[in-house]
Amino acid sequence: MTIKHPLVTEKAMNDMDFENKLQFVCHPEATKGDIAAAVESQFDVEVDSINTQVRMDGDKKAIVELSADDDAQEVASRIGVF
């Protein structure tokens, strides 16, 4: 299981609203390619880019930028962020 859950913070909400990005907490050994494939297959979107950070608790945070054709707010509402 590559993606554990969406990350819902104030910064994540700003990224979603203004930059068309979603944030997820992922398995620490997941690669950017693994994360992109999981996001594209689970949420039926196209990924433009991914930035990752390893958090202090050992999990990996992935910041996923969606293509211009996909709306991050619509995807977030489908997966239950709101």
Curated annotation (Swiss-Prot):
Which species does the entry assign this protein to?
Natronomonas pharaonis (strain ATCC 35678 / DSM 2160 / CIP 103997 / JCM 8858 / NBRC 14720 / NCIMB 2260 / Gabara)
Do you know which InterPro entries this protein is assigned to?
Answer: Nucleotide-bd_a/b_plait_sf, Ribosomal_uL23, Ribosomal_uL23-like, Ribosomal_uL23/eL15/eS24_sf
Question: Which Gene3D superfamilies does the record cross-reference, listed alphabetically?
Answer: 3.30.70.330
What is the protein's name according to its record? Large ribosomal subunit protein uL23
Transmembrane ranges, per UniProt, are none
Report the NCBIfam families cross-referenced here.
PRK14548.1, uL23_arch
Which Pfam families does the UniProt record give? Ribosomal_L23 (PF00276)
What function does this protein fulfil? Binds to 23S rRNA. One of the proteins that surrounds the polypeptide exit tunnel on the outside of the ribosome.
Family annotation (SUPFAM superfamilies):
Ribosomal proteins S24e, L23 and L15e (SSF54189)
Subunit architecture: Part of the 50S ribosomal subunit. Contacts protein L29.
- What high-level taxonomic lineage is stated for the organism? Archaea, Methanobacteriati, Methanobacteriota, Stenosarchaea group, Halobacteria
Keyword annotations from UniProtKB, A to Z: Ribonucleoprotein, Ribosomal protein, RNA-binding, rRNA-binding
For molecular function, the Gene Ontology terms on record are: rRNA binding; structural constituent of ribosome
Which GO cellular component does the record give, naming just one? ribonucleoprotein complex
Q: Name one GO biological process term.
A: translation
Q: Which family does it belong to?
A: Belongs to the universal ribosomal protein uL23 family.
